[in-house]
């Protein structure tokens, strides 16, 4: 029973991490959040990979560990499982459901990136206009000494 409970807890933690990964994926459509979201996703992937190694180790530890591994992967008949095993199966289903939602979100990322690219280009254009204005003031002799930077104001 200890192996089964350990598998359930690891799968539950994996589901939580995938849920966080999903939230970070949703942040990829905000220009200002994209770098943070990509870094957060990578950190979550590293944690998930660690959990996968621990789950695989349980599967390799014994015959019952292998059974628990297959239950967590939903590679068995639900009706033939004990109540505790069914709990592991359900957590495994939760992991797969989140993974499916993430795949669907990631299918839309190229479109989101195109929108982000347009937004960034627009920001660059706005900044270029401000730079041109500052250059114009400097050319007129007002940039460093005149109206724009007058210390008395």
Ranges and model annotations:
Residues 81-153:
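Short terminal interaction segments
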Residues 56, 60-87:
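Carboxylate-rich helix-loop segments that flank metal/cofactor sites and access channels
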Residues 4, 31, 38, 45, ...:
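Heptad-repeat register of long alpha-helical coiled-coils used for dimerization/oligomerization
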Residues 43-59, 90, 95-105:
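Amphipathic alpha-helical coiled-coil segments
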Residues 1-2, 15, 63-68, 73, ...:
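Proteins with a high burden of low-complexity, intrinsically disordered sequence enriched in S/T/G/P/A and R
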Residues 16, 20-23, 27-30, 50, ...:
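Heptad-repeat coiled-coil alpha-helices
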Residues 1-54:
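Long, hydrophobic N-terminal alpha-helical segment
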Residues 51, 73-76, 149:
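Intrinsic-disorder/low-complexity regions
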């Amino acid at each position: 029973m200890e192996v089964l409970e350990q598998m359930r807890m690891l799968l539950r933690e994996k589901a939580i991490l995938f849920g966080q990964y999903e939230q970070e994926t949703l942040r990829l459509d905000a220009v200002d959040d994209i770098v943070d979201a990509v870094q957060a996703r990578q950190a979550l992937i590293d944690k998930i990979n660690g959990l996968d190694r621990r789950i695989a180790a349980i599967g390799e530890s014994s015959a019952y560990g292998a059974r628990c591994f297959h239950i967590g992967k939903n590679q068995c008949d639900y009706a033939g499982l004990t109540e505790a095993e069914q709990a592991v199966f359900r957590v495994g289903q939760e992991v797969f459901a989140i993974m499916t939602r993430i795949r669907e979100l990631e299918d839309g990322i190229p479109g989101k990136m195109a929108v982000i690219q347009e937004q960034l280009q627009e920001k660059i254009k706005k900044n270029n206009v401000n730079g041109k204005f500052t250059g114009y003031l400097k050319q007129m002799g007002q940039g460093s000494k005149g109206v724009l930077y007058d210390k008395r104001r």
